From Swiss-Prot:
Annotated source species: Pisum sativum (Garden pea)
Lineage, opening ranks: Eukaryota, Viridiplantae, Streptophyta, Embryophyta, Tracheophyta
Protein name (database record): 1-aminocyclopropane-1-carboxylate oxidase
Keyword presence, Transmembrane helix: no
Pathway: Alkene biosynthesis; ethylene biosynthesis via S-adenosyl-L-methionine; ethylene from S-adenosyl-L-methionine: step 2/2
Gene that encodes it: ACO
Reactions catalysed according to its record: 1-aminocyclopropane-1-carboxylate + L-ascorbate + O2 = ethene + L-dehydroascorbate + hydrogen cyanide + CO2 + 2 H2O
Keyword set, alphabetical order: Ethylene biosynthesis, Fruit ripening, Iron, Metal-binding, Oxidoreductase, Vitamin C
Positions of the Fe2OG dioxygenase domain: 153-253
Length: 317
């Protein structure tokens, strides 16, 4: 089995830049995932985020989760559950307008560090998008511009905890899916594993690594790259012991951003369009009902809708 791709961002400013860019290229083409180290986010900040996230779960969310489990009788299930996930979550919106001040039960210190963490992740996301542009032969800033709607991109963070599960063979932590959006940056627990991706019809563990950021590509990057890069099915396996923390930040197109394959990435003599052109919010509305199904029917449905939907040009910045 090939080794999971680990990208040392610090090597981009050394004589190893070419090989590092090749590693990113291979990861995007063949994995849809890679893990970043030396990414510019301080160890101290990451440790604080982890500490306060776990404290918040214990203080404000653990009991609610236990009550939900008891209400639904999940500890006694005898057959596979396919309509819910074994996770406790809340969501923070950063762009276009932050919702952090509106989320109840967050301590002031937690709000402050999550705002700072989000700014660092936004910078990293935009740096990575430009690296992808370089590998794809697109002008610098192309992907960021493609994600811009009238109010800029959407950016938010899903904070998840996966408590110990008594029946992991019957209940998934998070069911298999591809991500709808652009580029996803994950700060995951380094002690409790669970995240897996599908590669060559086999489920492969995404290795927990302290202070790393896991990157994966969403459906929108598959469309814009005309399939050169792929979004990949992934899931979270619940564990019988140990609670797993997951902080996933989604740098997505704006609601009214128009998404379509980059013209320079269309193949010569390509007689039929493989990927549709659509407004991102229209895709999200479709995705919400089909998240845990294959992505191809979503693309096909958007393709069929193309003739009846008028979309304008990409917003310039």
């Amino acid at each position: 089995m090939e080794n999971f791709p680990i990208v040392d961002m610090g090597k981009l400013n050394t004589e190893d830049r070419k090989s590092t860019m090749e590693l990113i290229k291979d990861a995007c083409e063949n994995w849809g995932f890679f893990e970043c180290v030396n990414h510019g986010i301080s160890i101290e900040m990451m440790d604080t985020v982890e500490k306060l996230t776990k404290e918040h779960y214990k203080k404000c969310m653990e009991q609610r989760f236990k009550e939900m489990v008891a209400t639904k009788g999940l500890e006694c299930v005898q057959s596979e559950i396919d309509d819910l996930d074994w996770e406790s979550t809340f969501f923070l919106r950063h762009l276009p307008v932050s919702s952090i001040s509106e989320i109840p039960d967050l301590d002031d210190d937690y709000r402050k560090v999550m705002k700072e963490f989000a700014l660092k992740l936004e910078e990293l996301a935009e740096e990575l998008l430009d690296l992808l542009c370089e590998n794809l032969g697109l002008e610098k800033g192309y992907l960021k511009k493609a994600f811009y709607g009238s109010k800029g991109p959407n950016f938010g963070t899903k904070v998840s905890n996966y408590p110990p599960c008594p029946k992991p063979e019957l209940i998934k932590g998070l069911r298999a899916h591809t991500d709808a959006g652009g580029i996803i940056l994950l700060f995951q627990d380094d002690k409790v594993s669970g995240l897996q991706l599908l590669k060559d019809d086999q489920w492969i563990d995404v290795p927990p690594m302290r202070h790393s950021i896991v990157i994966n590509l969403g459906d929108q990057l598959e469309v814009i790259t005309n399939g050169k890069y792929k979004s990949v099915m992934h899931r979270v396996i619940a564990q019988t012991d140990g609670a797993r923390m997951s902080i996933a930040s989604f740098y997505n197109p704006g609601d009214d951003a128009v998404i379509s394959p980059a013209s320079t990435l269309l193949k010569e003599n390509e007689t039929s369009e493989v990927y549709p052109k659509f407004v991102f919010d229209d895709y999200m509305k479709l995705y919400m009902g089909l998240k845990f199904q294959a992505k191809e029917p979503r693309f096909e449905a958007m393709m069929k809708a193309m003739s009846s939907v008028k979309v304008g040009p990409v917003v310039s910045i």
